[in-house]
UniProtKB/Swiss-Prot annotation:
Residues 17-174 form a propeptide. This is Disintegrin and metalloproteinase domain-containing protein 32. The modification Phosphoserine is found at S17. Residues 1-16 form the signal peptide. It comes from Homo sapiens (Human). One of its GO terms (cellular component) is plasma membrane. Gene3D superfamilies: Collagenase (Catalytic Domain) (3.40.390.10), Disintegrin domain (4.10.70.10), Galactose-binding domain-like (2.60.120.260). May play a role in sperm development and fertilization This is a non-catalytic metalloprotease-like protein. It is a single-pass type I membrane protein. Residues 175-682 are extracellular. Keywords: Disulfide bond, EGF-like domain, Glycoprotein, Membrane, Phosphoprotein, Signal, Transmembrane, Transmembrane helix.
Length: 787
């Protein structure tokens, strides 16, 4: 007979209507990676790594060691319209790490490095979450403090499967136990199922859901480390379209249903225990499991309910407690059981606490008793969890192990190679064997250009530093600087002009299509018009505001059909425009050549960023604010650091340096001109104001001289008169509903003119008229001239 234990949610705690778990103290940080591969005998690259992570303006060094808890044959089972699909090749199994924080021996860190850093940093009594900042240009991450304000979150209750009384107690004390053997490594293989509601709650994205499950398993592993138990995630099943069993009822009822389904459908999938994760807003129980039944196939299962307003850290504790129950570990008596940390894992109040958690001595004795008396043979087989690279082979063209170079076979290397094909080390006298700054086996001198500008207005040419054969990182000017006569902005080192791009793809005369064409093609959300694919390989609709930020649509200027090898062409006749786009039939892993690039103009004052049409003023303002630190003698680059004008040097371009120049002088002039448009306008305005004043002043001086001469002559010729030529200029503009007419006339006469002069121009007078008339469907322009 077995007893069913349930994890009961406290009414005044986790399931209260107010949020209980909160993420606070949001920080944007840039972790700095430190290479520390100290294990030279290991065949696994980057087995040990370290990061410097700023928290609250203080730097912490995190030391990590690679952990393997994903099986090499790890599979994801996903459902789409009733049919099941499997995925495995896209899952990375060697980017999960655990470790601690330097100077804090009781700390615990669990991180994934697959795509940025994602995981939890736990100090003694406080925890921080970290994850990559989406759409960030640099290695920026969001760091936040995990905070829980609830009390009495959860307690365990038990239900007997039969109505017979049971002797055992839910709590155990630290009494003397019989001698048990030392612990030895055990491997618990899990098959986890995520129901439809939790799949949707986590975003309906298979990759996001997978990462969350992996993070939960990683946190559980960090807690089971002291027992030498590795929780191996052997497979993951996502009920993405519908639940395969009813999820209505209490946790114990759901467990019975899940066991029946498990026995029918999971026989061929290797696992020691199967778990069903279900989302419920406010469940009465948080889980159900049969204690002490780990290696009994009929009962090796559990159901864990994910309630509203809970963190992954807290849910990982719930899963850990349930796994511990299956391994015969009882719930602690807080009065009698102690652990090295402030809160023990099997403590009734552990879910409401933050920071590092460990098993108590009571849990250790209970676990030792279980493996000694009951046995855990099913956990003794070690699954393959790391794909070890083969031993280095010199001459295969791949850099492996301790090889300095590997150019391939003797024929492939050739006599001019800098690498010895026999030993895979550099030849005598050689300083390098490849790289943009390596020529004739020698490192090029400092200042030699190794990477020219990709765009003359938005990129920076990189030079060799004289010590490395590599060219160094590709640095561009900061996003937001104006380019192409202030029509566009620089973004990622380029000035994206959709008209020019259309012309390069579809030929001369092609232009970016009007919005109506984008609306016609992009609204279909198919292979011709979309904003990419989601994790389920479905096309994403752009949304009305973002239609131009999906795939490029152009006008087609000729009647000759456009031919694209290995591509399908679609035309759309919208109003008076012929629109065109192409699907290149490329693999999903290859970027779409017609995807609209970041920084492309999508509306007046707006540009595309990550397939969203956003205001460009924010990007421009960011560039302006950054460049203010350059003291007016430089602009910012993509690292938010100053590149200085000739004669000034970093970091703030304040100090003069004779002969120092980051940019060529002619380039820096144009850059500064674009970066300081306000300065240019100020000079122009000053010039326009000063010019009339100068003219008037000159005229007054000349007039005074002329008057002196006139009075002098008047004494001699009192009856003489002086006449001057006069001129009249008129500009007239007249508009109506049908069109507009603009006329400019100029008259010059040999005789003096006055305000009362009413004479009209004759044959010697000239007039020019320009007439423009436009209608809804056509336009006519006429220019006439008469003499």
């Amino acid at each position: 007979m077995f007893r069913l234990w349930l994890l009961l949610a406290g009414l005044c705690g986790l399931l209260a209507s107010r949020p209980g778990f909160q993420n606070s103290l949001l920080q944007i940080v840039i972790p700095e990676k430190i290479q520390t591969n100290t294990n030279d005998s290991s065949e696994i690259e980057y087995e040990q790594i370290s990061y410097i992570i700023p928290i609250d303006e203080k730097l912490y060094t995190v030391h990590l060691k690679q952990r393997y808890f994903l099986a090499d044959n790890f599979m994801i089972y996903l459902y789409n319209q009733g049919s099941m699909n499997t995925y495995s090749s896209d899952i990375q199994t060697q980017c999960y790490y655990q470790g601690n924080i330097e100077g804090y021996p009781d700390s615990m860190v669990t991180l994934s490095t697959c795509s940025g850093l994602r995981g939890i940093l736990q100090f003694e009594n406080v925890s921080y979450g970290i994850e990559p900042l989406e759409s960030a240009v640099e290695f920026q991450h969001v760091l936040y403090k995990l905070k829980n304000e609830d009390n009495d979150i959860a307690i365990f209750i038990d239900r007997s499967l039969k109505e017979q009384p049971m002797d055992d107690n839910i709590f155990i004390s630290e009494k003397s136990e019989p001698a048990v053997p030392d612990l030895f490594p055990l491997y618990l293989e899990m098959h986890i199922v995520v129901d439809k509601t939790l799949y949707d709650y986590w975003g309906s994205d298979s990759m996001i859901v997978t990462n969350k499950v992996i993070e939960i398993v990683g946190l559980a592993n960090s807690m089971f480390t002291q027992f030498k138990v590795t929780i191996v995630l052997s497979s993951l099943e996502l009920w993405s379209d519908e639940n395969k069993i009813s999820t209505v009822g209490e946790a114990d009822e759901l467990l019975q249903k899940f066991l029946e389904w498990k026995q029918s459908y999971l026989n061929l999938r290797p696992h020691d225990i199967a778990y069903l994760l279900i989302y419920m807003d406010y469940p009465r129980y948080l889980g159900a499991v049969f204690p002490g039944t780990m290696c009994i196939t009929r009962y090796s299962a559990g159901v864990a309910l994910y309630p509203k307003e809970i963190t992954l850290e807290a849910f990982a504790v719930i899963v850990t407690q349930m796994l511990a129950l299956s391994l015969g570990i009882s719930y602690d008596d807080p009065k009698k059981c102690q652990c090295s940390e402030s809160t023990c894992i099997m403590n009734p109040e552990v879910v409401q606490s933050n920071g590092v958690k460990t098993f108590s001595s009571c849990s250790l004795r209970s676990f030792q008793n279980f493996i000694s008396n009951v046995g855990v043979k099913c956990l003794q087989n070690k699954p393959q969890m790391q794909k070890k690279s083969p031993k280095p082979v010199c001459g295969n063209g791949r850099l492996e192990g301790n090889e300095i170079c590997d150019c391939g076979t003797e024929a492939q290397c050739g006599p001019a190679s800098c690498c010895d094909f026999r030993t895979c080390v550099l030849k005598d006298g050689a300083k390098c064997y490849k790289g943009l700054c390596c020529k004739d086996c020698q490192i090029l001198q400092s200042g030699v250009e190794c990477r020219p500008k990709a765009h003359p207005e938005c990129d920076i040419a990189e030079n060799c530093n004289g010590t490395s054969p590599e060219c160094g990182p590709d640095i561009t000017l900061i996003n937001g600087l104006s380019c192409k006569n202030n029509k566009f902005i620089c973004y990622d080192g380029d000035c994206h002009d959709l008209d020019a791009r259309c012309e390069s793809v579809f030929g001369k005369g092609s232009r970016n299509a009007p919005f109506a064409c984008y609306e016609e093609i992009q609204s279909q959300s198919d292979r011709f018009g979309n904003c990419g694919r989601d994790r389920n390989n479905k096309y994403v609709f752009c949304g009305w505001r973002n239609l131009i930020c999906g795939r490029l649509v152009c006008t087609y200027p000729t009647r000759k059909p456009f031919h694209q090898e290995n591509g399908d062409v679609i035309y759309a006749f919208v109003r008076d425009s012929v629109c065109i786009t192409v699907d290149y039939k490329l693999p999903r892993t290859v970027p779409d050549p017609l995807a609209v690039k970041n920084g492309s103009q999508c509306d007046i004052g707006r540009v595309c960023v990550n397939r969203e049409c956003v205001e460009s003023r924010i990007i421009k303002a960011s560039a302006h604010v950054c460049s203010q630190q350059c003291s007016g003698h430089g602009v910012c680059d993509s690292r938010n650091k100053c590149h200085c004008s000739p004669g000034y040097k970093p970091p703030n371009c304040q100090i003069r340096s004779k002969g120092f120049s980051i940019f060529p002088e002619e380039d820096m002039g144009s850059i500064m001109e674009r970066a300081s448009g306000k300065t240019e306008n100020t000079w122009l305005l000053g010039f326009l104001i000063a010019l009339p004043i100068l003219i008037v002043t000159t005229a007054i001086v000349l007039a005074r001289k002329q008057l002196k001469k006139w009075f002098a002559k008047e004494e001699e010729f009192p009856s003489s008169e002086s006449k001057s030529e006069g001129s009249t200029q008129t500009y007239a503009s007249q508009s109506s509903s049908e069109g507009s007419t603009q006329t400019y006339a100029s008259q010059t006469r040999s005789e003096s003119s006055s305000q009362a002069d009413t004479s009209k121009s004759k044959s010697e007078d000239s007039a020019e008229a320009y007439t423009s008339r436009s209608k809804s469907q056509d336009s006519t322009q006429t220019q006439s001239s008469s003499n």
